[in-house]
A protein has these predicted regions:
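Cysteine endopeptidase catalytic domains of the caspase/legumain-like
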Residues: 1-296
Length: 296
């Protein structure tokens, strides 16, 4: 539920708004341990430093996430400071990053109507079978694209819609670089090579937007593991440690987070920052030492 704004809750004259989403209990993909804890802890700390935070625990399905994003977008006024955080499953497909809601469906099976183009091809004919495999894979790729567009949330679209409201800055944090494979059991039953019938996630793609600060938990094209023995992800562990640091620019905070993650992972996990800020000296907690705080 959204936190109520109170007099003096926001530091300085600019409002601070945050939408924080963490999804653990996926219906059709591996359940995760950290996202819900990460979202709850981050929300609490953001509220403590003056953010108006929306972190409803009911936001899980595609319809709920899309409605919440729309409501959040419409709440943004020019010159607000905006923070968006998502933890859960995410996937890159054809250069776009998609955030997966709780009810993201299984890989769709190919039915007989989809295979009508290859009727009559003999499985004994090696050349024709290769043609059949190619056609099946093309059909599968189209189905993946269609279902992602209809049932997953395009991260770049969220970033664009938030930025279109003309906020002072958009801070966009994604902790969803987990590896998995979109499997098509129907193709495997037909004997199609698993390297062609299953589509492996390749991590997230870099994102850009003027006026935004974008941070991924790991570098584009790489992955992180869920940490079932720990309450928080490695990225969140260090974000929680640094985000309330007074008198520190947000870019420096995220660099400290990056250094901490790299140290703890022996450089196996490298967070990625994309900085296209229009303003300098953005402090989330306190004013810069002897500097003009552009946040105010």
């Amino acid at each position: 539920m959204a936190a109520e704004a109170t007099p003096g809750a926001a530091f300085g004259p600019r409002r601070r708004l945050a939408l924080v989403i963490g999804i653990n209990d996926y219906e059709n993909y591996s359940k995760l341990t950290n996202p819900k804890n990460d979202a709850e802890k981050l929300s609490s700390l953001l509220q403590n430093i003056g953010f108006i935070v929306d972190t409803s625990s009911l936001v899980k399905t595609y319809a709920e996430v899309m409605r919440k994003v729309l409501d959040f977008q419409l709440s943004i006024e020019p010159n607000d400071v905006v923070l968006f955080y998502f933890a859960g499953h995410g996937i890159q497909w054809e250069g776009q990053n998609y955030l997966m809601p709780k009810d993201f469906p299984k890989f769709p099976e190919i039915n007989e109507a989809d295979l009508k183009e290859i009727d009559g091809i003999s499985e004994k004919d090696i050349v024709k079978k290769k043609i059949a495999d190619i056609l099946i894979k093309d059909i599968s790729k189209k189905k993946i694209s269609d279902i992602l567009k209809m049932k997953a949330v395009n991260a770049q679209d969220i970033l664009n819609t938030l930025s279109d409201r003309k906020p002072y800055v958009t801070i966009f944090l994604l902790d969803c670089c987990r590896e998995y494979i979109l499997r098509n059991p129907d193709l495997n039953r037909r004997g199609v090579n698993s390297n062609t019938s299953n589509f492996k996630s390749t991590g997230l793609a870099a994102m850009h937007k003027a006026g935004a600060l974008i941070a991924f938990a790991c570098a584009p094209g790489t992955f992180v593991d869920d940490r079932p023995k720990d309450k928080n992800s490695l990225f969140m562990k260090h974000l929680l440690e640094h985000i309330t640091t007074p008198n520190e620019d947000i870019v420096n905070i995220l660099r400290d987070v990056t250094n901490g993650v790299m140290k703890d992972s022996n450089d196996e996990q490298i967070p990625f920052l994309s900085v296209q800020l229009r303003h300098n000296n953005i402090y989330l907690c306190g004013q810069g030492r002897g500097k003009k705080n552009d946040f105010e």
